[in-house]
Amino acid sequence: MFASKPAKAYVFFLANPQPQNASSQDMETYPELMMQQVQSLSLILTREANDLTQAQCDVMLNGESTGILVPGHILEAAVQVNDQRYILFLTDDVIFEESLTIALIDVHDGLKEIVRLGNEYSTGSFADLQITDDSVNFRFIGDYIWTVEVSDSPRLHLPFISDPKGLKRESGLKKYIAISATPSPENIS
């Protein structure tokens, strides 16, 4: 009367299978990629700037389109954070009102976050890029050294409290990019 259904088979895969009695010396380790400046990224202009909006560009990785669109016209620098994430430092080449756009992109997940550094009628010049294992330092506006750190997962962002003056980001309670500004050593008396 009743047809029997075939038994279901379940297969489980462990993300990181490890022998239960293996010591840390037996385990193979892989070094993490340290932040580094790269030349493998470039931009292709998709929309010119106008009075109301920044220029927009498609991000190219090794000459291939990523499909990721970012605001800005000039790629000042690109820093590889890990095997799929990059920090882009972008400007629009606007005299007397230059601002810096910092974009975090993920080649698999697209644009993760954008922050902007600058104010009306202020000029800045991107300079002195220095990269450590977990941060990027540079100069842009004023006599400050700006430091950018990126987290793997979003962190709590408290609007109006946690960012230095001149930094703008979209409203929300999460961030991947943390930015701080410290007076440059030659200006401390």
Could you describe each region identified by the protein language model?
Residues 64-69, 113-116:
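A short beta-strand motif characteristic of beta-propeller blades
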Residues 28-46, 130-189:
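Acidic, small-residue rich beta-repeat scaffolds with periodic aromatic anchors
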Residues 49-54, 95-98:
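Short, solvent-exposed loop/turn segments at conserved positions within beta-propeller repeat blades
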Residues 96-103, 144-149:
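Structural motif
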